[in-house]
Amino acid sequence: MLHLVRRLATLVSVPALMLGLVSTSVAAAAPTTGAPTKLNLPDGFQPEGIAIARGTAYFGSRADGDIFAVDLKTGAGKVISQGPGTGSLGMKVDRFGRLFVAGAAGGNGRVIDTRTGRVLASYTFTTSATTFVNDVILSKNAAWFTDSRQPVLYKLSLGRHGKLPAKPQTIPLSGDYQHTAGNNANGIALTPDGRGLIIVQSSTGFLFRVDPRTGVTKRIDIGAAVMTNGDGLLLIGRTLFVVQNLLNKVAVLTLNQSGTKGTLVREVTSPDFDVPTTAAAFGDRLYLPNARFTTPPTPTTAYWATAISATTKPIKHAVDEGECDRIRFLAPAQ
């Protein structure tokens, strides 16, 4: 199922638990043998984001913001939350079962109860027409959102027991990051040590480490590699997956603990990809929604998510904001 484009290393190992910003949420181990490798989504859905928790994948529609939940064991799914009419892009689930959703051109973010589909909170980050709230990552005490049209991050500070804030904060980006025309800050992840944030700038293909206290950015040294069309990011241990949407591939990098330097170790693709936008992990697989940006959307256009083999040996603990099992990468997926 998975075609290897380039193999630069055969062993990627996962270090000790991330510290600092990292969430303490843990997901139960879940074998995926026999589960479907293609998840069919509603016709015309136009997926963009994905989050996984407790064997369920949540997909957001960039068309109307609906949230569609899929049982990873069976592939059966249903809409659990009606959208606001604007897109639902990047998403993450916290340990309380709350889905944090980036609101695209709406300039907002929502928090949804995955059990009931009820919107628990909605935040207006900006009233500017020049906005595209693109992705979100959860740390221990905050949710962080990117805006591809504004040189800022939006922060929702979480209180005791995950209490949601009354209003968001805006953190201007400075340092090496230079805002350009087109899509800018897109995917976001934590650094391996949990002390910083990582963003990918789609227009340049650069990765940046962000100081969460100040917004000061420093370009991550990844040698001559460029993350062209970089979209969603997924960090597991010191392994960073960068989904390169229009290139139909995923770059796999090994980072140092502080997230200031990395090495491209391989690139992978699948014949089932059709502009994948981001990735979430469960068991021994990565799941990627296919946005099909190059296909004109109609009410009958087919959409799906692709599951690719990511690992050979899930191990006991879980990382990455409660969404995936802690994993040792023994060899490239075949």
Label each region the model flagged.
Residues 34-41, 75-82, 118-126, 167-180, ...:
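A short beta-strand motif characteristic of beta-propeller blades
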Residues 111-170:
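Hydrophobic alpha-helical segments and helix pairs
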Residues 74-111, 119-127:
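Blade-loop segments of beta-propeller domains
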Residues 278-330:
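Blade-level signature of beta-propeller repeat domains, shared across WD40, Kelch, NHL, RCC1
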